[in-house]
Amino acid sequence: MIASKFGIGQQVRHTLLGYLGVIVDVDPEYSLAEPEEDEIAANDELRAAPWYHVVMEDDDGQPIHTYLAEAQLSSETRDEHPEQPSLDELAKTIRQQLQAPRLRN
């Protein structure tokens, strides 16, 4: 079993671009269609490591869904980000839902 470095609801940073994001799902390995040779996912070692569905914001503050390798992410040390409060709220909401799941009928 592969252990993931980051968890759902955790805030992270893109290591190269510095963008803040919130993890919304984790795949134990790359699970999208076969990547093109020039994509980062073409690397067999990276494909075998965990991949993360991460919500980030574009330049206009609109949410965007990204799919990133564990090697592309780093832990975020701050809990509050006045410049991106919607991502703080998303992370908080996800963590609350994980701690107190609702029963379905």
UniProtKB/Swiss-Prot annotation:
GO CC list: cytoplasm
InterPro entries on file: Hemimethylated_DNA-bd_dom, Hemimethylated_DNA-bd_sf, HspQ
GO BP term, pick one: response to heat
Highest taxon in the source lineage: Bacteria
The entry's keywords: Cytoplasm, Stress response
Location in the cell: Cytoplasm
Keyword Oxidoreductase: no
A Gene Ontology molecular function term of the record: DNA binding
Primary role: Involved in the degradation of certain denaturated proteins, including DnaA, during heat shock stress.
NCBIfam families registered for this protein in UniProt: PRK14129.1 (NF010729), yccV (TIGR02097)
Family: Belongs to the HspQ family.
Name of the molecule in the record: Heat shock protein HspQ
Originating species: Klebsiella pneumoniae subsp. pneumoniae (strain ATCC 700721 / MGH 78578)
